[in-house]
């Protein structure tokens, strides 16, 4: 392989990593660890976090299982079409790995799962149900799935992610310790915080799909309000409200200034990234790396703040 080919292949690596949704899996694990520490619960074992990772990767790859024949300029769709066979085998292998991991998980914790209370089952079930309704089905529900309700889409994604990374780690601890799941005010605050943060990221991500959503009459906030109004009247005010609420919470609970500073970094970056969307059109990788990357930044900052300050 010549030098130019090696360099070209190197430039493709970020696309492979982000288009394959492994980055989402990494973010889900990192946010789960952060939420456990912030709620002062023990970290779960490797198998738990592996299931979080592999399930997230598989879920986000679901829309691309079928090779599309429609004309498209979407880089991610084009990438999946180009690497269709590779990703098909990737899906099969991941599904097999997930099945084996679930068997091992149930082998260790099957008795605990069987003893779950009705309340625990309800909490466990609500987030996968909402996640399934987001995609719908190709038979009857696909025509009316939640994904087609443009303004609702960010809230559905934010709710599902908040449940996965905030509720599930604590729920799992309550199950294996044979305790009733009873989230405190800290847990509720963190759920709302993660819900709002990820919802704002989803609204920013809709900027990328403005032309397509407008064509297919997907009434997202960006389509309804326009880019400038979405940023100025929605993203910036909500980002500032989230930042203000955290600072108020942190000061009333006597957080150290270092801890407060670390946890404000993700909100400040979110506001700056939202403003950057006004300047010029951004490529898809910008949204995958920079916008979605704020989830990882939030997790890292929150984890460092809890461990060392």
Where are these regions (language model features)?
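Catalytic cores of Mg2+-dependent Asp-rich isoprenoid enzymes
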Residues: 2, 6-39, 43-52, 224, ...
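Central hydrophobic cores of alpha-helical transmembrane segments in multi-pass inner-membrane proteins
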Residues: 29, 33, 52-69, 127-135, ...
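Helix-coil boundary and interhelical linker segments in multi-pass alpha-helical membrane proteins
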Residues: 30-51, 103-121, 166-192, 247-258, ...
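Membrane-embedded alpha-helical segments that form the functional core of polytopic membrane enzymes
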Residues: 43-62, 125-129, 182-204
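Transmembrane helix-loop-helix
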Residues: 91-139, 235-282
């Amino acid at each position: 392989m010549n030098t130019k080919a090696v360099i070209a292949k190197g430039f493709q690596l970020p696309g492979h990593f982000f288009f394959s949704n492994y980055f989402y899996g990494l973010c889900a694990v990192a946010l789960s660890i952060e939420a456990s520490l912030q709620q002062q619960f023990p970290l779960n074992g490797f198998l738990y976090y592996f299931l979080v990772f592999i399930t997230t990767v598989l879920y986000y790859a679901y829309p691309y299982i079928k090779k599309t024949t429609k004309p498209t300029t979407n880089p991610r769709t084009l990438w999946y079409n180009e690497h269709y066979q590779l990703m098909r085998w990737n899906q099969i292998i991941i599904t097999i790995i997930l099945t084996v991991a679930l068997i091992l998980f149930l082998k260790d914790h099957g008795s605990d799962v069987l003893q779950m209370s009705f309340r625990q089952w309800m909490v466990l079930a609500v987030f996968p149900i909402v996640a399934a309704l987001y995609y719908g089905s190709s038979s009857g529900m696909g025509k009316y799935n939640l994904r087609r309700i443009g303004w609702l889409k960010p809230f559905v994604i934010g709710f599902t992610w908040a449940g996965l990374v905030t509720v599930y780690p604590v729920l799992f601890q309550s199950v294996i310790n044979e305790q009733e799941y009873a989230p405190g005010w800290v847990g509720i605050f963190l759920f709302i915080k993660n819900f709002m943060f990820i919802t704002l990221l989803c609204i920013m991500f809709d900027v990328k799909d403005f032309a397509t959503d407008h064509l297919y009459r997907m009434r997202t906030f960006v389509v309804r309000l326009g880019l400038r109004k979405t940023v100025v009247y929605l993203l910036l005010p909500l980002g500032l409200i989230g930042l203000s609420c955290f600072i108020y919470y942190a000061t009333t609970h006597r957080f150290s200034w270092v801890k407060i500073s670390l946890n404000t970094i993700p909100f400040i970056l979110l506001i700056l990234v939202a403003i950057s969307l006004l300047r010029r059109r951004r490529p898809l990788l910008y949204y995958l790396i920079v916008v979605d990357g704020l989830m990882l930044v939030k997790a890292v900052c929150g984890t460092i703040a809890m461990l060392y300050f």
